[in-house]
């Protein structure tokens, strides 16, 4: 029978000092011997997705203590990618994922916690906590802060739905008046919560449901809705159940590596492709799989992308639907239910909400469940009242959206497309692959041939786009922005937004060894691997080269001869210490980021640390 990890610091005369310190935190005599449950909260006043999380730890702690455990909360950092974007702050976003993972490991192992509740929400926080959970392999459950309500405003007497990307595009579009731009800005992000579309934060919170590590509704229930309170309380109760199963009954199915196994990673990626999730999710799933010691690779993602249809289309791919609409249509369980009926899921995978995924779907998939409470749960809707408070409203839709022909979630027969929302491309530009969010690409752009316009940094690319250097037919190449070359693998939402604002959104392509915000749409190809700083071919592209992109064929090609490519590589290598470095780029890189770059791998490995360098 597994012994409580916390016994290391609570049992025996030699631990008198540790017990004295535990007592100083409020632990009583009759508490010793109970499981100690760590609550990793990511509350911060910097991030709208986290501004309402301050009291969530206490909520979860109360449920844990009622169920017979000891709850101890600590905090992690949380970077807001939207606020950090467009300047040097974005260099810190992806590296913060590793910092969060390490900080969770440090706190849990230093204090011998027995189990873990992860209160996350935004872009790098959920992945960082997921990596730590799978590294630690102790009972865990995730509960996120929930999505923001979609913005709404009237322009030209027409009610429109908005999100962060609309504000960014309008701000850079000279055709939009100052008054309209300000109105969009003030309306785009009305409440607390993670940005309202299928961007990275919401994509990752949805994927925790498919991985089996969070409760139904975690990815879609609005941050403002009163029903979300119960998710936090139930997370506290469930973690005690998981801890009891493992420590008292030796049930290893309660451990995260047995829940998030290969089948679960396939389920999560299948969901991701079906819902057109953020391309960043590929990066994070690959990283999490390595922590779980699961052999899940880009080859698996490529294979699944050819099988899975696009069943749910959400902003930024369409202005019609946001996360509040996904929830009304049955949330993640609604999408998984359709995938299950299409025989595309492993429904025998374990799940924290039930015996296995099949049992959870039987209750929570609105297309098959007749549970009135479940239908009421998915009727939770927005109030349209600006607020930073959680659980501040209890508005409901008149009915759920169970229209699988023309609704937000479709059956396979009526899919938005029979090919999914993400694809892996490869070719001489990206020998180890790259990622495109096909859900956001117009069909006429699925094949594209253009002339390369090369930039050594995101900043130079932005200047080129806004300065009129980039014209229709160009393939904008932004390199040395990968995990090592940036360092930090910046998101390229500003370049893509500015292309749209200049009317070039469907007239140009963009490829980069950096990455894209979940808010990106258009022919935007990221995660090019190997990255330029690691000797990738993208570092050899020259302005004027022809680049051929063919999404149906899953290919991306630099149209020069192998002889010419080899000659360019030889010339680059001849530069010695100056090889594979950006020409003329001026960028201050802090010591912390230099340390990150030393161990960073390219995106096809999830941009995790190359631990072989530590041997």
Swiss-Prot record:
<comment type="pathway">
    <text>Amino-acid biosynthesis; L-valine biosynthesis; L-valine from pyruvate: step 3/4.</text>
</comment>
<dbReference type="Pfam" id="PF00920">
    <property type="entry name" value="ILVD_EDD_N"/>
</dbReference>
<feature type="active site" description="Proton acceptor">
    <location>
        <position position="517"/>
    </location>
</feature>
<feature type="binding site" description="via carbamate group">
    <location>
        <position position="124"/>
    </location>
    <ligand>
        <name>Mg(2+)</name>
    </ligand>
</feature>
<dbReference type="InterPro" id="IPR020558">
    <property type="entry name" value="DiOHA_6PGluconate_deHydtase_CS"/>
</dbReference>
<feature type="binding site">
    <location>
        <position position="491"/>
    </location>
    <ligand>
        <name>Mg(2+)</name>
    </ligand>
</feature>
<feature type="binding site">
    <location>
        <position position="81"/>
    </location>
    <ligand>
        <name>Mg(2+)</name>
    </ligand>
</feature>
<keyword id="KW-0001">2Fe-2S</keyword>
<keyword id="KW-0460">Magnesium</keyword>
<keyword id="KW-0479">Metal-binding</keyword>
<feature type="binding site">
    <location>
        <position position="195"/>
    </location>
    <ligand>
        <name>[2Fe-2S] cluster</name>
    </ligand>
</feature>
<dbReference type="GO" id="GO:0005829">
    <property type="term" value="C:cytosol"/>
</dbReference>
<comment type="function">
    <text>Functions in the biosynthesis of branched-chain amino acids. Catalyzes the dehydration of (2R,3R)-2,3-dihydroxy-3-methylpentanoate (2,3-dihydroxy-3-methylvalerate) into 2-oxo-3-methylpentanoate (2-oxo-3-methylvalerate) and of (2R)-2,3-dihydroxy-3-methylbutanoate (2,3-dihydroxyisovalerate) into 2-oxo-3-methylbutanoate (2-oxoisovalerate), the penultimate precursor to L-isoleucine and L-valine, respectively.</text>
</comment>
<feature type="binding site">
    <location>
        <position position="122"/>
    </location>
    <ligand>
        <name>[2Fe-2S] cluster</name>
    </ligand>
</feature>
<keyword id="KW-0100">Branched-chain amino acid biosynthesis</keyword>
<keyword id="KW-0456">Lyase</keyword>
<comment type="similarity">
    <text>Belongs to the IlvD/Edd family.</text>
</comment>
<dbReference type="GO" id="GO:0051537">
    <property type="term" value="F:2 iron, 2 sulfur cluster binding"/>
</dbReference>
<dbReference type="InterPro" id="IPR037237">
    <property type="entry name" value="IlvD/EDD_N"/>
</dbReference>
<dbReference type="InterPro" id="IPR042096">
    <property type="entry name" value="Dihydro-acid_dehy_C"/>
</dbReference>
<protein>
    <recommendedName>
        <fullName>Dihydroxy-acid dehydratase</fullName>
        <ecNumber>4.2.1.9</ecNumber>
    </recommendedName>
</protein>
<dbReference type="GO" id="GO:0000287">
    <property type="term" value="F:magnesium ion binding"/>
</dbReference>
<dbReference type="GO" id="GO:0004160">
    <property type="term" value="F:dihydroxy-acid dehydratase activity"/>
</dbReference>
<dbReference type="InterPro" id="IPR000581">
    <property type="entry name" value="ILV_EDD_N"/>
</dbReference>
<feature type="binding site">
    <location>
        <position position="123"/>
    </location>
    <ligand>
        <name>Mg(2+)</name>
    </ligand>
</feature>
<dbReference type="GO" id="GO:0009099">
    <property type="term" value="P:L-valine biosynthetic process"/>
</dbReference>
<comment type="subunit">
    <text>Homodimer.</text>
</comment>
<dbReference type="InterPro" id="IPR056740">
    <property type="entry name" value="ILV_EDD_C"/>
</dbReference>
<keyword id="KW-0411">Iron-sulfur</keyword>
<dbReference type="Pfam" id="PF24877">
    <property type="entry name" value="ILV_EDD_C"/>
</dbReference>
<keyword id="KW-0408">Iron</keyword>
<comment type="pathway">
    <text>Amino-acid biosynthesis; L-isoleucine biosynthesis; L-isoleucine from 2-oxobutanoate: step 3/4.</text>
</comment>
<keyword id="KW-0028">Amino-acid biosynthesis</keyword>
<feature type="modified residue" description="N6-carboxylysine">
    <location>
        <position position="124"/>
    </location>
</feature>
<dbReference type="InterPro" id="IPR004404">
    <property type="entry name" value="DihydroxyA_deHydtase"/>
</dbReference>
<dbReference type="GO" id="GO:0009097">
    <property type="term" value="P:isoleucine biosynthetic process"/>
</dbReference>
């Amino acid at each position: 029978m597994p012994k409580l990890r916390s016994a290391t610091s609570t049992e025996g005369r030699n631990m008198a000092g540790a017990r004295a310190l535990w007592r100083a935190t409020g632990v009583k005599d009759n508490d010793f011997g109970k499981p100690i449950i760590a609550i990793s909260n990511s509350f911060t006043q910097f991030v709208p997705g986290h501004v309402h999380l301050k009291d969530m730890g206490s909520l979860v702690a109360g449920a844990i203590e009622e169920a017979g455990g000891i709850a101890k909360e600590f905090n992690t950092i949380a970077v807001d990618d939207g606020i950090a974007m467009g300047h040097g702050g974005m260099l810190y976003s992806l590296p913060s994922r590793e910092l969060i993972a390490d900080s969770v490991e440090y706190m849990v192992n230093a204090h011998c916690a027995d189990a873990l509740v992860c209160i996350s929400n935004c872009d790098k926080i959920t992945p960082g906590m997921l990596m730590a959970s799978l590294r630690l392999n102790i009972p865990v459950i995730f509960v996120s802060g929930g999505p923001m309500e979609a913005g709404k405003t009237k322009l030209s007497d027409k009610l429109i739905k908005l999100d962060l990307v609309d504000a960014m595009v309008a701000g850079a579009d000279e055709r939009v008046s100052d008054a309209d731009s300000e109105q969009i800005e003030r309306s785009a992000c009305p409440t607390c919560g993670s940005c309202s579309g299928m961007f990275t934060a919401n994509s990752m919170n949805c994927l925790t449901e498919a991985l089996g590590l969070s409760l139904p509704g975690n990815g879609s229930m609005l941050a403002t809705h009163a029903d979300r309170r119960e998710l936090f309380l139930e997370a506290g109760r469930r973690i005690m159940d998981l801890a009891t199963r493992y420590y008292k009954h030796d049930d290893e199915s309660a451990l995260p590596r047995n829940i998030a196994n290969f089948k679960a990673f396939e389920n999560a990626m299948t969901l991701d492709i079906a819902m057109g999730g953020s391309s960043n999710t590929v990066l994070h799933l690959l990283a999490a799989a390595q922590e779980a010691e699961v052999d899940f690779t880009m080859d698996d993602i490529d294979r699944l992308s050819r099988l899975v249809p696009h069943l749910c289309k959400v902003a930024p791919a369409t202005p019609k639907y946001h996360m509040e609409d996904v929830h009304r249509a049955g949330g993640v369980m609604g999408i998984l239910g359709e995938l299950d009926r299409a025989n595309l899921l492993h429904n025998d995978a374990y799940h924290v909400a039930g015996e296995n995924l099949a049992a959870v779907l039987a209750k929570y998939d609105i297309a098959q469940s007749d549970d009135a409470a479940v239908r009421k749960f998915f009727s939770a809707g927005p109030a349209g009242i600006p607020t930073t408070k959680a659980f501040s409203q209890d508005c409901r839709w008149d009915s759920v959206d169970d229209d699988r022909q023309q609704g937000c979630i479709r059956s396979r027969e009526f899919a938005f497309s029979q090919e999914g929302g993400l694809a892996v491309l490869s070719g001489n530009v990206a020998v180890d692959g790259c990622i495109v969010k096909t859900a956001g690409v117009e069909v006429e752009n699925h094949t594209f041939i253009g002339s390369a316009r090369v930039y050594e940094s995101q900043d130079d690319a932005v200047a080129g786009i806004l300065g009129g250097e980039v014209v229709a037919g160009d393939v904008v190449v932004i390199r040395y922005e990968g995990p090592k070359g940036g360092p930090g693998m910046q998101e390229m939402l500003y370049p893509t937004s500015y292309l749209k604002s200049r009317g070039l959104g469907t007239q140009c392509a963009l490829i980069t060894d950096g990455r894209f915000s979940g808010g990106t749409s258009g022919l935007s190809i990221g995660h090019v691997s190997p990255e330029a700083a690691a000797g990738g071919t993208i570092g050899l592209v020259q302005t004027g080269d022809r680049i051929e992109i063919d999404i149906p064929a899953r290919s991306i090609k630099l149209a020069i001869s192998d002889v010419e490519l080899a000659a360019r590589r030889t010339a680059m290598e001849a530069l010695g210490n100056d090889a594979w470095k950006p020409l003329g780029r001026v960028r201050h890189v802090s010591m912390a980021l230099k340390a990150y770059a030393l161990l960073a791998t390219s995106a096809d490995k999830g941009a995790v640390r190359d631990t072989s360098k530590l041997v």
